[in-house]
Amino acid sequence: MSDQYAPKPEHKFTFGLWTVGNPGRDPFGPPTRPHLSPVDIVHLLGEVGAYGVNFHDNDLVPIDATPAEHDQIVKDFKKALADTGLKVPMATTNLFSDPAFKDGAFTSNDPRVRAYALSKTMKAMDLGVELGAKVYVVWGGREGVETDAAKDALEAGKRFRDALNFLTHYAKDQKYDLVFALEAKPNEPRHDIYLPTTGSFLGFIETLDHPEMVGVNPEVAHEHMSGLNF
């Protein structure tokens, strides 16, 4: 590869821990790649000229980690960032893997699950800001239904709005230099996901308490699933 095309940090390419660390598993078979720790991934990205690394909370800290384990993982990750010069531009929350979210996170019919989703997101925001994130992505992969009778769509929209309002107020109260980006997808893992397109999110954002703090994160493959493009 000529120097002209060699990747450099100033090109601002960033990668998710969940992409580089993917074990090569699909629904029909077991993992096919060796495990890479978050620290390993940061050093690998540093070697190939990446600018930064992004993560879901549980990509970095396992959901069942003890407080002591959490602190050690974050300490080691910070050292890897310092050693390589990589940045953390964006962070997000895994609101889809825990079985508690089978009916949704912010839109769940169970108020205990909705409270858990908010608590998990606030802790993940704290972690993201601690590591330098300026953008916080919200992807509602479980916010939807398999059948319309499962959930009141209008009530679900209100719950989602209340959650975003709560989180923007939390960010302001904590004086975080943080903006939110809403990521759309029409389906998967739910059969029908609420607010399935970037356009629907643009309309939704205008109904929030602090629309100036919220934007969109168009994901190429998700847009194509809706028959859209950039």
Spell out what each predicted region is.
Residues 15, 55, 138, 182, ...:
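Conserved beta-strand positions
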Residues 52-77, 140-141:
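Glycine-rich, proline-tolerant flexible connector loops at the mouths of alpha/beta enzymes
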Residues 226-230:
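Histidine/acidic-residue-rich catalytic or RNA/ligand-binding cores of hydrolases
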Residues 33-40, 44, 65-79:
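Aromatic- and glycine-enriched glycan-recognition loops and surfaces
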Residues 16-25:
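Short polar catalytic/cofactor-binding loops
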Residues 33-61, 123, 132:
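Catalytic domains of carbohydrate-active enzymes, especially glycoside hydrolases
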Residues 1-17:
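N-terminal amphipathic alpha-helix/helix-capping segment at the start of soluble metabolic enzymes
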Residues 72-93, 97-215, 225:
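Active-site acidic/histidine proton-transfer and metal-coordination neighborhood
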